[in-house]
Amino acid sequence: MNAEDFFNQGFNNNLQGKYQAAITAYTQAIKLNPDYAEAYHNRGIISSILTDYHSAIANFNRAIEINPNFATAYYHRANARYFLGDYEKAIADHNQALAIDPNLAQSYHSRGNAYFALADYDKAIADYIQTIEISTQLADNINNDIANAYHNRGVARLDRGDSQGAIADFQEALQWYPHFAAAYSNRGNIHQMLGNYHEAMADHDRALELDPNLAEAYHNRGNAYYALADYESAIADYNHALKINPNFADAYYNRGLVLSHLQNYQAAIEDFNQALKLNPDDVQAYCERGLVRSTLEDYEGAIADYDRALQENPTLALVYGFRANALRRLGNYQSAIEDSNRLLQLNPNLAEGYCDRAAARRSIGDHKGAIKDYDRALQINHNLAAAYYGRGIAREALQDFPGAIDDNTQAIELMPDFSQAYCNRGNARRLLGDEHGAIADYDKALEINPDLIEAYYNRASTRYALEEYENAIADYTQALQINPQSAAFYSDRANARYAIEDYHGAIKDYTQAIAIDPSFAEDWYNRGRSYSLLQEFNSALADLNEALQRQPHWTSAYILRADVYRNLGNLQQAIADFQKSAQLYYQEGNIQYYQQIIQLIEQLQQE
């Protein structure tokens, strides 16, 4: 057999799928004719079929070496290089093939694939269309490729912020392939970004009609429902997406956002955990989980999340702000200030950043520094109610009560339902002696927020100062309904009850206060005083002993205990306590009271 016979044998074996036999025959042909370019070419094609691309390339190299104008050898070598991921060299080979044979339609198609792999969609589309113009027979097979190229170019344009160009490309993709579910879904995403929610929903619905298992379409429709505040439908779609694809990190993340919005914080954290398990570098998931943890007062956990986010991307200005707030909640004010500094270095015109730093400065007593920050925030945004409110707090701390009133008034004008601003303005008015104005502000604060405990407490204190004891008791009672574990509230209500001579009621409240916090000497003293007025002298004595144990230099307590001892007939102990009180008055320089107590002691000694 000659070389031609072996070549024909190889060709026939190839047609029958007998690839190894074909390779053997072509090899025999090459041995008989070492310059048999077609034999190298065909042996290279079989190597490509068998995915032995390196051997294929070696065969095509030899064929081209023998015949530099062998267009299909360049074409097939290009395809082998494409499958090895060497797209640039593949394109170079297609260029050579087309220079030799401009009508080689397959080479345009394959070069288009290489451009597609390099995300050069413009050139890919041009090559695909050129393929159809040369060979209408390839049109049916290539329409999907053209649609894919337009679709991917649309995705790339969207990533660059060219939403209109992206929509045009998705529409073009759908003209080439009307059943392209992903193109509908991605066009729906753009409609959603542009606020066209109904168009977005229609596109996602169409995508799911075409492909009921397209997890991305459920996810994207869920995002549209979320934007429309239809949270139940959003969660249902995320659930469906995750049923189809349990490893869909974005679906966990976005479901977490919805659950967080619905205040289902533990479930939200679980979803963010899953998202991060699947995508450990998702900075946004760390941020959102940190925000939820802050809401749950897990500030250390929140800080750990913010740390990780900033480790991935140190230029996230807002995350420094989030971490600053968490640090401030933990009392780490200096670190909070440092984070606010970093935020403001990255974004010097973020008014809220100055407010956050001001809050930390207030916490360390730097009220003047805080005011400077609030001033700067208001230069940037003169409608920032939080800045007026915070500056009002700082001014009150510096005893600039008129300034505090002005700032809270500005905050209220910007936010008429800002209950805390009414409360703080009431505080400043009370400190200026305008008790009735203060009460009016507390009334308004409670009208807006009936659970604002500070307003009840401060209104009660103001009413107590005005000797409106019954009203004060009512307000303290309201405060205690909100927080029944406040010793101070019981103590102050007891004082009001004492003032209206309800000594039994006062004793009950002092007892509650002592049960919550037994360290407060005044409660022991005041309960002892109440017992004394009820002539329950033994109980009074026990309480006064406790008071003096906690505060051993308390003149009034010694005088009261002396009186109790006298009522119990223990003159010796009464005289001893009066002597102690006289000694304390003398040390204080209060000679008048000292002399009065000495006279009283002399009278007792004569009895």
Where are these regions (language model features)?
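Alpha-helical tetratricopeptide repeat
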Residues: 1-607
